[in-house]
Each structure stands twice: as structure tokens, then as C-alpha cells.
Amino acid sequence: MKSYISLFFILCVIFNKNVIKCTGESQTGNTGGGQAGNTVGDQAGSTGGSPQGSTGASQPGSSEPSNPVSSGHSVSTVSVSQTSTSSEKQDTIQVKSALLKDYMGLKVTGPCNENFIMFLVPHIYIDVDTEDTNIELRTTLKETNNAISFESNSGSLEKKKYVKLPSNGTTGEQGSSTGTVRGDTEPISDSSSSSSSSSSSSSSSSSSSSSSSSSSSSSSSSSSSESLPANGPDSPTVKPPRNLQNICETGKNFKLVVYIKENTLIIKWKVYGETKDTTENNKVDVRKYLINEKETPFTSILIHAYKEHNGTNLIESKNYALGSDIPEKCDTLASNCFLSGNFNIEKCFQCALLVEKENKNDVCYKYLSEDIVSNFKEIKAETEDDDEDDYTEYKLTESIDNILVKMFKTNENNDKSELIKLEEVDDSLKLELMNYCSLLKDVDTTGTLDNYGMGNEMDIFNNLKRLLIYHSEENINTLKNKFRNAAVCLKNVDDWIVNKRGLVLPELNYDLEYFNEHLYNDKNSPEDKDNKGKGVVHVDTTLEKEDTLSYDNSDNMFCNKEYCNRLKDENNCISNLQVEDQGNCDTSWIFASKYHLETIRCMKGYEPTKISALYVANCYKGEHKDRCDEGSSPMEFLQIIEDYGFLPAESNYPYNYVKVGEQCPKVEDHWMNLWDNGKILHNKNEPNSLDGKGYTAYESERFHDNMDAFVKIIKTEVMNKGSVIAYIKAENVMGYEFSGKKVQNLCGDDTADHAVNIVGYGNYVNSEGEKKSYWIVRNSWGPYWGDEGYFKVDMYGPTHCHFNFIHSVVIFNVDLPMNNKTTKKESKIYDYYLKASPEFYHNLYFKNFNVGKKNLFSEKEDNENNKKLGNNYIIFGQDTAGSGQSGKESNTALESAGTSNEVSERVHVYHILKHIKDGKIRMGMRKYIDTQDVNKKHSCTRSYAFNPENYEKCVNLCNVNWKTCEEKTSPGLCLSKLDTNNECYFCYV
């Protein structure tokens, strides 16, 4: 009963009470857009109304429908009132969707200011921006990885050319504009009519939304874009012609029908007024796309919609199952993972099978990857105490825990802690600090404490306090990790980076002084122009430009023009290249160069294999004695490759900074050559670039008046090659305490002294409420620096800067053959559930962020709101700040920083998840406390308690032990082994 009341409370708080009628009964309903009986499914605006059954979710491990978060209590149906006022509509998601009865497809309707994204799992992605009437199709197939603009209909998938089959693309619509399906008649029925106007529009790309200074890809055929005045500034602006008959406007509604007929994907688009006017335009925009019959068929349709109103942010994700060929018990486990809000369905599904102790011959195991099945026994044998035999490591962990407790004090109200002052350091803390640094020296391999003097108790305390202040918003596990950076034990801590750079800028001349602006703009090739028209586009044709044909960039859920973070995909080759530490040696140029080549190998289909940095350091034709004290550049890296024609793996010749300067080793028979069949290409002579053999560099200063072009170059190279080398100025900017999770807004310099790698990019909203974009940068200072070795920096930097923080970017021009032999197949479970990235949901919020509607919540208000919500019965991911030891320690660090503003921006986001199968709807919910919470790869707040009263206990157990289990093959299984009372379920975390 408690969970029953909690669900009703949440639903009635989230949605307008006048729109949602809270009852305890299921209610039959139609889709609201077509005639009864012609569509099946639920309405997008509802919270669980089902035409044929009640909502419900399943308990972990159970194949019978039950509630996964309320320990067996049924989840009540919440039905939608059929009438609502215009003001009430603002409170709910107005995008409504329903399955078609006679076709494999979906009908979506709503007002013209509502946007949504649709996936035809596992292949097709459709992004619908109704405000600009911009519909874009992408595909996850390796051969067809870019975008098609619905409007352009030019037969172009950006860099890939497609064969067009003649057919009418725009038809007149007969009958009601509701698009009712009658018998065998197609949705939004067609009749012949005149062709739609043809415009010379290239395929549009939805790129990262950003502020006026941010990058924005040109979206051709956008209704909001305007051409320049023809006769001066006083002339009226003229909108470019559109290649669509139906253009969304305020006050109108849209209807989109997507369905499969034989081997053709058909999309129909219609705009109409709120009242059906018989004199209204009766044209329907229709596009048809051939799909490859040999590919895995579509198994489900997933639709995402977003709504923000009065500080409440709703994300609704609905998964419509199209078939039932997956065994029921397997589908139940997987759908539970989806409903929990877990992005990594495979990891969660794998954990569920392991926790349930199913043997590897169970039918559900065939939906996992081959590696998991083949290593079944090893995974099951993994224990939580694998490393407990390392006594020094154990004592170091214990010492860090003691210091964190002793460095904070509790005030008289016992509700707020702060860092102690220097004069408050007692003898026990002094002893612990010295013991801590002694233990750290024993395990440290970077040479920090061997080459610089160790500080006394006061030095160490001040260094740690400075670290805690700069990382005030980190959780306890992250802080413990940062305490393993040996720099905190130095007497003069700023000396730490003196020998951790090592870039010497090469002397090169510009091959082309003049910047060809058109090189970086989207433009149509002659083939594109020939393909303009209306009809059927071949989605599986393989003609493609040379620069992308040879790279496997099919992971566009994790890396595309809007955002790119392959680190969030645990199965990706690049995410398995662990951060390295160059040690006390000026070798950043080697680590940045070799990582760039490693990611190129990943994008060519090779296994994640590290290149030996020590081999490159020692195999050069010069003096060896000062090799660790003088830097160089990526040009020398390429020269060494060409001179020797060999690159061993890191495992063949491991890096140790003390060995830098030795003689070049003799290649042994068992060593692997990672440069086998590789070639360094000649100069490309790119405009506005510095060129060497196998090397192209772009200085940001040359793009001062066109930084968008500079950004676009980097994005393109990261998408294709996995990374670029970046030159930056680290001196007096980056130290041991540098925060990696916050986006740094930094100026640059006219010179550079350090080489790093740009590995991705994303979007954020700054403290002023402006939409901005950032680079994800990988450093070579070890995993205890920054955000596990990475940091974020604003793409454009402050407006007053003379130089961008990224001084230059470098791209290798090398030829490596594609390796198709070792390409691993995705787990079969992703044929039924979307392989999603946390970045996708964060980007969904970002694209719809309205600066004028942002709402601020204090931390106190957050805690009060969470108390009202009760335990985590229905809401997945409820905030548990302040509960348990771990939570307390985390909050003390937050409050001790003395932030300039006690009221921080906390945007409450509620994620409603629905799984619709066989007319039944099962529902889950998750609450995020802020936008960064949306972006997290894991969250202990998704812990599940079989008895709801133990929820906080389960979350605390997860937080305390996460570091122990994080690197295990199945962290959820590891946590379950630590739950000796069997009170919790951790597969959702």
C-alpha cells in the first residue's frame, strides 16, 4: 500500500492534476488521433494508460509481471482525461504515439513546438525538430553511418552516395487528416498529385546546440534560417524555398507516420490546424527508403520526447515491442533493465543471469556476447577480495579513510561539516599524514617522491586541503582515488609538472596561406545534384568518399556531430585504452602521438593494444643522456616509425620513466609489430595548415575569425580517427589539483609546452544559463589526476582571450589496412533493445533547454523534496544525499569548499520509461537531481531493495564498496556477493 500511495503522489505531482485522473483501475482508450481499433499502444502524454491491460513492471529475475521496485505490489494504472485546456497541455508531454494496426510502424502526433526522437531498433534513427520542420534520418549500419535529410530528398547520405529510384514524393491526402487506417489502406492514404517543389538543399545535420559563439552545423532547408537581404540592411528578409509541402507553425499540429512495407521504409509527414478545415492544404510529404533485406529485422520502436514546464523536466521513453521471438523470461530480465533507467542493457542483463545463477547453457545466454559466454566460469569465480593479499595497498586504503574522517569537523547542530583549519591539526592526524605518504611512496611508480622532496605534516595537510576545495562536488570514492596522487606529499607541490610536459613545437611553414572557407562547408557533389528529386533512396548502397570509407565509425549513438564520448561504451576499443602516466619525464609528445595512432587502429577494426612508449623514446638517432629532460614533437614519432618500420606493444617493452635514455632494444621474435603493413602518407596540403610527411597541423590562431571551421575540423577527425593530438600551454594553468569534471573556461597562449589528445566533445549549460560546448581531453598524468585522467575545456573560451586554449591540433595521415577479422558482433540483446549512451539523454535535455525557464533549487529544498517522495519504490534513482556514512562524507566535501553561491542550479529531471508489448504497458520512473546526474554511466541510487525500508542501506552498501567492484566484469554481481543478508539487487546500478 505504501508504494501504491507513493506512485499516485509522484504522478499527480509531476503532471497537472486536472489532466491526469488518478484511479486504481485500468481504462480502455484509443490513440486520440485515429479511429478506434486502427492503432494499438499508449498515448505519449499518459503515464501508463493501456488499451488492453494494466501497467506493471517485473521483479528482478522473475518472468511474471510484477513491480520491480515495490517488492511485488502491483503498479496502478493512471489514465488520461480526454479533455484538457490549453494551459493544462503545457504541463504534459504532448507528443502522442500509437502502433499501427495493419502495418509494422508507428503514428506520432502533437503540436508543432514539440520535438521527439524515434529509433527503429536496431538500425534506424529519426530526429524530428518540429519547430524548424527538420527531419533527419541516421542509421547504425556500418556501411551507412551518416545522415539523410527528409527534406532534401537528394539521394545523399552526406558523404555516401545513394541510388535514387523514381517515385512521387508528395501526394494529396484523401479523407480525414487524422490519418485513419482503414483495412488495407496505407496510413495517411496517398493519391497522385503534383510534385513538391525541389530545392537545392544538402543533407542537414543536427549539430550541437550552442550559444552564438558556439559551433553550429549548417542545417539546409531550415524554416527558421533566413537569406541575406537582397538590397541592403533595410530590405525585408526572404526565407529560402522549402522542399516540403507541410511546414510547422505555431498553433498547428503535425502527424508523422513511419512504417515498413516489404523492404521499404516509408515516412509520411502532414501539418494541419487545430480545427480541421476542408479548404486546408491536403498534401502529404512522403519519402521512401530501401532497406537491406539481409540485415536483422526491426524488433522494436523506441520513441523519446522531452518537456520542460515550471521547473519540471520530463523525459519520456517508450519502447514498443514489434515481435515476441525472444523468450519471455529473457525479455523480462532485459525490459527490467530498460525500465530501471540503466543505459547499459547488456551489462545489466548479464548481471541478472549471473546473480540468478543460471548456467551458461541457459537460452538467455545466447543474447550476450561470445566473450561473456566463453569466460563464464572466470566471471563467476571473481571475488570481491582479489586484491586483499596486497598488504601495503590495504593499509594505504585504510590510511586514506582515516584522513578523510579527521580532516572534517561537525558543527554544533550536527548537520553540517567543514574542513578543519591548520591550527586544528592534532598529533594523531599528523602521524597519519606521514604514514600515508610513506605508504604512497611504496606503491607509486611515477617517480614523484623519488625526485622531489617530501613535505612535512603541514605541507601535506595544505596540499590535501587545496585538493579537497578544488574537488568539492566529488563523491567519496572519487576523493579517495585522488588521494593516490603522490603530488600531495611534496614540499613544493607546484614542482610536480616541471618534468611532466615535453612538447617542442616543430619549425614548419604554411604550405597554403589562404584559407579556403568552402573546404569546411557542406556542399553537394555533381552526383548529389543528379540525385535530386523525389522517390526511393537506397539506404544500403556502399559508394562513399575515401576519407570515411576506411574507418569504422558505426558507433554513432556514442559519437556523432552533436556529441562524442566513446568512453561511455564499455565494449568500444577506445574505451579499453587505459590512461597512462608519463612519470617524471618530458615525454608527453610520445604519449599523445602513440594514443592517436592507437585510436586510429581502433577505428580500423583492430583490438585495443597499447604501443610501447619506451621503444619510441629509446629508438631515435640522437643523444640519449638527456632524453627525459628534453621534449620533442609528433614529427619525430613519425620519423622513428619510418626509420625502423616497427612498433612493439606495451606488453613487449613496458614503459618505466627511469629506463628512458637506454639503447634501442633488439626486436625479439615474439614481439608484435603494430605497424605491420602501415604506411606514412605524403603531405595533404590542406588549406590553412602546417604540413609535414604524414602530419597535418592546424593552429587555432589562423582560425581566429572562423572558429566554427576549426571546431568542425576537430569533430570530423575525432569521429573518423578517434582522437587528435592537441598542443596546449600547461605551465601555470594545470596542477595536481586541476578539476576534470567541471568544464574549464580557459584562455590559451601564443606558444605551447604540452601535448594531449582531444577524444570527444559535448554540450553544457554554464552558470549564466548559456548553451556551450566543450572538448573532452585526455592527459598522460595518470588516472588519479583530473577526471580519471581526462578533463573538459570550453571549445571557444572566454570572449576576451587573445588565444584559444587549444593552440594547435595535429592529425596523422597514415594508411593502415582495415581489419575485419576481429570485429566483434554486438550482443544479440541489442537486436531488441537500443544500445544507448548517457550522453544521448543529456543531449536531449540540452537541445530542449530553455534559458528563460530555468529553475533554481537549493540543496535544502532538494532534500525536503526527496523526503516527500519517500523511499525509492517507484522513482528509480532517488537522491539519498546525507544517508549513510558515504553520503555524509560526500556532502562534507561539498559544503567545505565555501562556494560563492549557496543556491546552485539543480534542474529536476524525471525520466518516465514504458515498455509496451502485446497490448500491456509496464512502467518505471527515475529521478535525476541535476543534469550531470543524467550523464552518469553508473549510479548507486538505482540499487533495489527487496524490502523498501532497506533502500538507503542498499545504496550505502553500493557507495562504500563501489571502488572494490568497479573494475570487475560484473560490478553488480560483485556487490551482490558483499550483500551477505541478500537484501539488495545491484544489477541496475
UniProtKB/Swiss-Prot annotation:
Which keywords fit this entry according to its UniProt record? Cell membrane, Disulfide bond, Glycoprotein, Hydrolase, Malaria, Membrane, Phosphoprotein, Protease, Secreted, Signal, Thiol protease, Zymogen
Q: Which residues are glycosylated?
A: N168, N310, N820
* Cysteine pairs bridged by disulfides in the record: C437-C489, C559-C564, C573-C602, C585-C628, C619-C664, C747-C801
SMART domains found in the cross-reference section: Pept_C1 (SM00645)
Residues covered by region (Interaction with PTKL):
208-245
Site feature Cleavage: at which residues? D184, T185, E382, T383, L834, K835, Q878, D879
Assembly and interactions?
Answer: May interact (via C-terminus) with PTKL (via SAM domain).
What is the protein's name according to its record? Serine-repeat antigen protein 5
- Species assigned in the record: Plasmodium falciparum (isolate CDC / Honduras)
